[in-house]
UniProtKB/Swiss-Prot annotation:
Protein name: D-alanine--D-alanyl carrier protein ligase
GO annotations of cellular component type: cytoplasm
Matching PANTHER family: ENZYME, PUTATIVE (JCVI)-RELATED, PTHR45398
One Gene Ontology MF term: D-alanine [D-alanyl carrier protein] ligase activity
Organismal lineage: Bacteria, Bacillati, Bacillota, Bacilli, Bacillales
Keyword ATP-binding: yes
Species name: Bacillus licheniformis (strain ATCC 14580 / DSM 13 / JCM 2505 / CCUG 7422 / NBRC 12200 / NCIMB 9375 / NCTC 10341 / NRRL NRS-1264 / Gibson 46)
PROSITE patterns documented for this protein: AMP_BINDING (PS00455)
Length: 502
C-alpha cells in the first residue's frame, strides 16, 4: 500500500523527523516504523484469525499511531476506541466486532466482560534489531484498514469498514488537491475513535509532516491549550467548526498566536458563514476549506475553498464539489435522480464508499447498493446541487451532527427510556445560527422519591453516564405530564421543538 510504503521511505530518509507530538511525548518516523514493526511481530505471534479486527484503546498518545500501523502491517484492521467511551459501549463494540485482541494503551485496566479476547499492553517497544514484516501480509486493496463505530438506532453502535483503497483515495485527494506541503505540522483535535482524525493523521504521515495532538485536558482547560498552541508551529488546522468557534471566543486566537498557520480544513458538521468570516479576519494569510462526508464514505467527499466571493454570495455555505473518483447524485423518494436545484437525498458513489457495516448484513443491504456499476451509499442526508456545488440541508431522519459527532437521537432516547426513573422520553435538538447547540430531553418521569427536579436529573444522568459518551447526554432535562402526539399517533416532534424554542 502506497501510504505504508511512504511512511517506510520517510523512516529511512528522514528518521529523526518528528511524526507525532503531544504534551508529554514525541515520536520520530524512525521510531514509528521500528516500534510498529516490533508490535506487528508481537501481534502475529498471537495466532489470531486471519484479518480479524483488533481494538486499539487509548487517547492521544504516540503509541496509538504505532498500534494502528502495527495492526495493518500484521494484516489486521484496527478499531480505535478512545478512553472517553463508556464501558458499556466498549463491551458492545467488543461483542459486535468479535475482536480477538485488544491493545490497551490507556495505562489503566479495561473491562472486557466475559468476551473471549486477549488484552495486550504494548509496553516497551524499544530494543536492538528490528524485525521486518512481510509486505505481502500488509493490509492492501479491498482489505479493511480500519473500522469506526458510529451511533446506531437500536442502541447498538455500527462498525463502518473502510478499506485500504478507500483510505488511499481519500489521502491522495487531501495531499494532492488541498494546499498541503511536505513537512508541515498538522493539528489533531478529534479523538481517534472519531473519523475526523483520519483527515489529519494519514495526510500528515503521507506528506512527511508532524501530527500535533490536542488532549482532553487541553480542551477542558483553554489556558493550557493556548499556551501549548503558541509553541506548536501548527500549519494545518483540522477540526470541527465548533472547536474553532470555541477558540474564537478568546481574542488572542489569531495570526499572532499561530503565525505559521496556512490552512483550515473543516468537517464533521455545518460550517457557519460567521465562523469562516471571523477566521479569515483573524488569520488573513490562511485559506479556509469546508468539506462534507459521512463515515461510510471515508471522512469527506466534497470540498470548497471559502473565499471572500463565496462568503458574499452565500448566506449558508455550500459544501463544495466532489473529489476525484466520486459522484454525488440527488434522488427523490422514488429513487430517481432530480434536476439541478431540486432537493432530495444525497447519494454518494465511487471509490470512497465503504464495504458496509461489520457483521450487519441487513443494515448494509439497506444503506449500500450499486449505482451505474459503482458502489453507492444512501446517506440519509437532505441536499441539492446547483452549478456543480452541493448544499447540505441536514438529516432526513433523526440522526444529527453535534459538535462534529454523528448521533442518532433514537439511541439516546432508547437509553434514557431504560432508566427506572423514566416513563417516556423524547430528545429534541436546540438550534442556534443554523446548527445544533445542544440536546434537550423531554421526559415523563416514572414514580420516584426525589423532592427536587435537579435530584431526578442527576439520577438519570448517572444512569446514562455508564451507557453513553458524554457528548450524547442531553444538556437540559425538562419534565412534563405527557408527550404530545400527532393525529397519526406519532410523537409530535414539531410541537415539542416549537415549545423548547419559545
Amino acid at each position: 500500500m502506497k501510504l505504508i510504503e511512504t511512511i517506510k521511505k520517510y523512516a529511512q530518509t528522514q528518521p529523526d523527523t518528528l511524526a507525532f507530538v503531544n504534551e508529554e511525548e514525541k515520536l520520530t518516523y524512525g521510531e514509528l516504523w521500528s516500534q510498529s514493526e516490533r508490535l506487528a511481530a508481537r501481534i502475529q505471534s498471537e495466532a489470531l484469525t486471519d484479518a480479524s479486527p483488533i481494538i486499539v484503546y487509548g487517547h492521544m498518545k504516540p503509541v496509538m499511531a504505532v498500534s494502528f500501523l502495527a495492526c495493518v502491517k500484521a494484516g489486521h484492521p484496527y478499531i480505535p476506541v478512545d478512553v472517553s467511551i463508556p464501558a458499556d459501549r466498549i463491551l458492545k463494540i467488543i461483542n459486535s466486532s468479535k475482536a480477538e485482541l485488544l491493545l490497551n494503551n490507556s495505562g489503566t485496566s479495561v473491562d472486557t466482560g466475559d468476551a473471549l479476547i486477549s488484552v495486550v499492553e504494548p509496553g516497551v517497544l524499544e530494543g536492538d534489531g528490528v524485525p521486518e514484516t512481510d509486505p505481502g501480509r500488509w493490509v492492501h486493496g479491498e482489505d479493511t484498514f480500519y473500522i469506526i463505530y458510529t451511533s446506531g438506532s437500536t442502541g447498538n453502535p455500527k462498525g463502518v469498514q473502510i478499506s485500504a483503497d478507500n483510505l488511499q483515495s481519500f489521502t491522495d485527494w487531501i495531499t494532492n488537491d488541498f494546499p498541503v506541503e511536505s513537512g508541515q505540522v498538522f493539528l489533531n483535535q478529534a479523538p481517534f475513535s472519531f473519523d475526523l482524525s483520519v483527515m489529519d493523521l494519514y495526510p500528515c504521515l503521507q506528506s512527511g509532516g508532524t501530527l500535533w495532538t490536542v488532549t482532553k485536558d487541553m480542551i477542558n482547560r483553554p489556558k493550557l491549550l493556548f499556551e501549548a498552541l503558541k509553541q506548536s508551529n501548527v500549519n494545518v488546522w483540522t477540526s470541527t467548526p465548533s472547536f474553532a468557534q470555541m477558540c474564537l471566543m478568546d481574542p488572542s486566537y489569531s495570526e499572532e498566536l499561530l503565525p505559521e498557520l496556512s490552512l483550515f480544513m473543516f468537517c464533521g458538521e455545518t460550517l457557519p458563514a460567521s465562523v469562516a468570516r471571523q477566521l479569515k479576519e483573524r488569520f488573513p494569510k490562511a485559506r479556509v476549506f469546508n468539506t462534507y462526508g459521512p463515515t461510510e464514505a471515508t471522512v469527506a467527499v466534497t470540498s470548497i475553498e471559502v473565499t471572500d466571493d463565496v462568503l458574499n454570495k452565500y448566506s449558508s455555505l455550500p459544501v463544495g464539489s466532489e473529489k476525484p473518483e466520486t459522484e454525488i447524485v440527488i434522488i427523490n423518494e422514488d429513487g430517481k435522480a432530480v434536476q439541478d436545484g431540486e432537493k432530495g437525498e444525497i447519494i454518494i458513489t465511487g471509490a470512497s464508499v465503504s464495504k458496509g457495516y461489520l457483521g450487519e448484513k441487513a443494515l448494509t443491504e439497506k444503506a449500500f447498493f450499486s449505482y451505474n456499476g459503482s458502489p453507492a451509499y444512501r446517506t440519509g442526508d437532505a441536499g441539492y446541487k446547483e452549478n456543480g456545488q452541493l448544499f447540505f440541508l441536514g438529516r432526513l431522519d433523526f440522526q444529527i451532527k453535534l459538535h462534529g459527532y454523528r448521533i442518532e437521537l433514537e439511541e439516546i432516547e432508547y437509553q434514557i427510556n431504560q432508566s427506572r426513573y423514566v416513563q417516556s422520553a423524547v430528545v429534541i435538538p436546540f438550534y442556534r445560527e443554523e446548527k445544533i447547540e445542544y440536546l434537550i430531553a423531554m421526559i415523563v418521569p416514572a414514580e420516584h422519591d426525589f423532592e427536587k427536579e435537579y435530584q431526578l436529573t442527576s439520577a438519570i444522568k448517572k444512569d446514562l453516564g455508564s451507557k453513553l459518551p458524554a457528548y450524547m447526554i442531553p444538556r437540559k432535562f425538562m419534565y412534563q405530564k405527557e408527550i404530545p402526539m400527532t393525529a397519526n399517533g406519532k410523537i409530535d416532534r414539531k410541537r415539542l421543538k416549537e415549545e423548547v424554542t419559545v
